[in-house]
Amino acid sequence: MTSTILASSQQTRFHIANSTMSSLSGTSSSSKDLDIPDVSISISNSDASDKKKGSKGSVAENEKEILADAHLKLSSGVHYALVGRNGVGKSTLLRAIGEKLIPGIPLDIRIVSMQQSYDNPEIKSAKDQMSQGEDVSVLDFVISSDQERTEALRRQKDLQVALDNTQDPTAAVRILRQFKFDDEMRVLDEAKKAANLRSGARGMAARKELKIIETRVEEKRVGLEIIDTQTLAEETNEAMMMLSDIEGFLEQMSPSAVESRAKLILRGLGFKLKSPPTVTQSLSSLSGGWRMRALLASVLFQPSDILLLDEPTNFLDLPSLLWLETYLQNDLPANTIVLFVSHDRAFTDSVAEEVLVLRDLKLERFPGNLTAYEETRSERQRYLTKMAEAQSKQRAHIQDTIAGNVRQAKSSGDDKKLRQAASRQKKLDDRMGYEVGSRGGKFKLNRDLPGYHLTSRAGIEGMIPKDEAGVKMMLPREPGEELRFPGPLISVEGLRFVYRQRGAGTVTVKEALSGVDLVVHPKSKLGIVGLNGAGKSTLVRCLVNQFSEGGGKIVSGSVKYHPAARIGFFSQDAIEKLPLDKTALQLMMASLGDDPGSASSQHEARSVLASVGLTSFTVSSVPIAKLSGGQKVRLALAQVLYPPPKLGPVPHVLVLDEVTTHLDADTVVVLAEELRKFKGAVVIVSHDRWFVRKVVELDGGEDGSAEGDEGDEDDVGAEPGVVYEVEKGRLVELKGGIADFEKKIRSRKAG
């Protein structure tokens, strides 16, 4: 069963933007803004791939709605952060925009996207080349990602070879006709897409245009090999002119300048240009994380009108992340639209100029970054709540006054007063509501509430921003078993760890860790930061005593464990190890003992999953393959907290390696609060500066949480933890915490 994205908009039934026709005619639309009303998007799990979205507002049972009559507006040159809970469809929306599935997106607009997946089309293309024996280097992969330039180079080569072919004078003509045929096929594909998106009179006109193009394509197909000697010289001259135009286009981008720009981007993302260079390594030799960096480099390298980035910071260390911040802020063309999703709050606040909030099937737009949005929303919520309460008291007072007047009128038989009371009641019902105009001044009905309404004022209660249901996550407060005697949980002393790399008859020893000392006490909160490749993951593997085959060994020093200590380990590849064909409930029930299928076992498994926010239909009917990245992280975290064979007991120490990857901002906030309340030890390896500050340093910075959070009570008397940096195989305590590390990185980049 495959998933299909179904998209519609107002453009479907009424009109397609003029830019769509301009792309078919070969011209380019001047504006690159997107302003599309009534956008509806859903995901269908039906096998019928040619199924179209039904009538407005109708959704089939096998469809999941992402947007319903939402307004999609992206302005030229603005950087947008797309935020929303895990599973609401942020990645689906980016894909729908990137693949131009939404009617009204101009076909000639250049959209470049990075998806949150190893199965990205660009990576797949590179893999196809590898399977055919055409392995590509990282640098070549990035340079060749500019498809317009790559196609121009291919045509230049083919035309030059054909024109130099003295044995076959018709070679250049055949190549010219093939190029024209390829261009017509692209126009045909666009015409089919435009015809499918239209209806009514415009749809009929589009289908007539499609018939004309199909006829033209068929004529060119037939004429590919039929060469008229009378037009041979004319078409050969046309081929020479095409070659001249292509060479003029390529002269504007010299090979040296192109390579320099590609190297600049790769270097910023952590690739080495020398000693030894990693930009010349084959793409197939890279790990998954470094392949995603190469993909990000290729996306940044390509010219674009709209740049879509889905979790671009997931595989970046702090230097690369800071470089990406600067690049997006300062080095993109001024009119480029950027729409990105990121769980890193510091990165989001730094890059975003506006926020798009995907909530309740709508897109809410806010001018400012994420922190400003949360502050403004909270302030408006408090302001309108107070206004509603005050007006409620005023309404009650007026209602009492009217009731008193009615009683007096009835007792005295004064019909005039009775009519007066009825008039006041009518005014109360019609005009009591929001009294502030759209410009902040006095309310004016025609300007501020146009159209037909049941009353002359909007109700205040309906204007108060509604809070989403809180992120559901309640981790255990303490380890499952009390230690019978005191002592450190993990003690590392003088640790030296090496890798042995075998070459052609030689063995190279690479030192990963040297002289490392570390003690994890029962209530320690420790943060470990450092550059990629510095040895963080190696240190973590030593702490949890998990090594891959041929993954090196400890040659001196020691790692000692409390004999009764239980260690829970969340690895970077935890979600990749999940069985995709099972449901979350099936996975957790398989961890139970003698009778995993019993009702009591199912209840226990559901309780465990509910503690990390996975409930109902999601755990029982949705295969793990269909879960969002954040939901998979929650499931993997549940396995760490409640290990088999009996779903427990809870470990004494949690070692979490990049656990915030794929989590939305709200979930990261709640996870940080829950880890602060955990009475066991926590060791965090993370590039998320905010997360380390919150959990380890007990920082109470901006997080969007409500005032007076109950988690503050758990911090009373608690001492901040310690942040360490792994640098060139050594472990160094950072006295100033994560701020010291960030300061060091920025000064190093400036130098």
Each predicted region: which residue ranges?
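Internal hydrophobic scaffold segments of catalytic domains
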Residues: 138-145, 153-158, 165-168, 411, ...
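Eukaryote-specific, cytoplasm-facing alpha-helical/coiled-coil scaffolding segments in long proteins
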Residues: 423-430, 451-457, 536
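Amphipathic heptad-repeat alpha-helical coiled-coil/stalk segments that mediate oligomerization
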Residues: 438-478
